[in-house]
Amino acid sequence: MWSIFEARPKEAHSVNKIGWLRASVLGANDGILSLSGLLVGVVAANADIKVILITGVAGLMSGALSMAVGEYVSVSSQADLEDADLQLERREMDADWDAEVDELAAIYRGRGLDEELSRTVAVQLMEYNALEAHARDELGINIHTTAKPTLAALSSAASFSVGGIFPLLTSLITPLEYLSLVLPIATMFFLGMLGFVGAHIGGAKRVRAILRAVVLGLLAMAATALVGRLLEIHALSLQYAI
């Protein structure tokens, strides 16, 4: 039986991949859908290839920067909140150590330990690392996985760019007269592959992940194509009115 202070052998659980897998899939999915939706809308408005490519490059750059800034702000805010909670916990332990022991013991009693054992565990954990014990069991914070806003921002921008480059390249190599048909089909393929890769890495059901990505992506592109078509009709009506 392992002691609570001994290192356990690591087990390969899929849940351990949730953080980085979610961020990577989310960024790449946003890149594919944002660029595809934007390009489909422009194509539906009968824009020429120059306008389509300029729109695609601008969308890729603005989307990547937006993802980076949003992720940086989000992770920084989370880090600030966690740090404030840890500082408060330090002050509470300095002010009344015994009360913090009782608080930790009460948490363990709520998880099924008896009175004596819960207090023994609380005392030993606080003697070993009081802040870590309270951060983990009271606040739900792992002090060993500190937030890295810059890394998170760069990763988010990179994953968005990787996803967005595929529909942009599709627009580059496809003749304009076929683009309205090829781009949605290619996007469905890209989304399906992304769903498959995410499900494979995470150990989830692949068919469900693929269908979810493809169906939702198709709905998003249909909406943007409709908007583009309506804008073209409106522009033509204004032109004839003038």
Swiss-Prot record:
The modification Phosphoserine is found at residue 3. One of its GO terms (molecular function) is iron ion transmembrane transporter activity. It comes from the Eukaryota. It holds the Pfam family VIT1. It is found in: Endoplasmic reticulum; Golgi apparatus membrane; Vacuole membrane. The chain crosses the membrane at residues 25-45, 49-69, 153-173, 181-201, 213-233. It catalyses: Fe(2+)(in) = Fe(2+)(out). It is a multi-pass membrane protein. Has a role in both calcium and manganese homeostasis. Involved in the transfer of iron and Mn(2+) from the cytosol to the vacuole for storage of these metals. This is Fe(2+)/Mn(2+) transporter pcl1. It comes from Schizosaccharomyces pombe (strain 972 / ATCC 24843). The gene is pcl1.
